[in-house]
Structure formats: structure tokens, C-alpha cells
Amino acid sequence: MAMQLTDATFEVEVLQSELPVIVDFGAAWCGPCNAIAPFMDQLSEEYAGKAKVFKADIDECKALAMKFRIMNVPTILYFKGGQVVDKHVGMGTKQVFEDKLKKLI
């Protein structure tokens, strides 16, 4: 299951991670965010030990949402070496998200 990220845990969990990281920015009230949540949970389980997958609620992680200029949800950011290396905005299939992740492993 994808772990919940907070403003306080972001630096350690994402920026300092030696593994590639997906951060799924969404909100509880967002239908498309809820629709892709199972995909993120599946990727978290399938790539355990190879990548990390986090969820960040924009209503709770306002500083992060502002820092990365999250204007629409869902927005998925892909990090490697503490840097954003790819981005996806809107709905997508599990395959779309997985293909982007595979490029980072």
C-alpha cells in the first residue's frame, strides 16, 4: 500500500531516498485521485525494495503542493536522486504509471 507523505517526512522519504520515488498528489474529494489509488497501491507492493510510492494529500501537504506548483489533481511526480525527473497530470492506467517507473529503475 502506498504510504502517506507529509510536509515533515518529505525530505527524508523522497529527497534523500536512494530508490526512485513516485509521489501521487491528490485529495480525498477528488474522484480521479480515488480512481487511480488502487494502481498506486499495487505499484507500491509490486516494486517494494526497488521503488517507493507515496500519496500526498494537497489539503494536508500545502507546502509541498505549493513548492511543486500542483495546480491539478491527480499529479504524479517521479523522483530520482532527489530530483523530479518525470510528471503525469490527470487520469492514467496502471500501465502508464508503471512504464514511467520502470525507466527509473
Where are these regions (language model features)?
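Short pre-active-site segment immediately N-terminal to redox-active cysteine/selenocysteine motifs
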Residues: E18-L19, F25-W29, N72
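A short beta-strand-turn-helix
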Residues: M3-V21
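Structural alpha/beta surface segment adjacent to cysteine/selenocysteine redox centers
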Residues: L64-V73, L77-F79, M91
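Structural microenvironment flanking redox-active thiols in thiol-disulfide oxidoreductases
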Residues: I58-L64
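Conserved redox-active cysteine motifs that mediate thiol-disulfide chemistry
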Residues: F25-F39
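Conserved Rossmann-like nucleotide-binding pocket used by diverse enzymes
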Residues: M1, T6, G26, F54
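Non-catalytic, surface beta->alpha helical segment in thiol-disulfide oxidoreductase systems
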Residues: Y78-I105
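Conserved helix-turn-beta segment immediately C-terminal to the redox Cys motif
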Residues: E18-P20, A37-A56
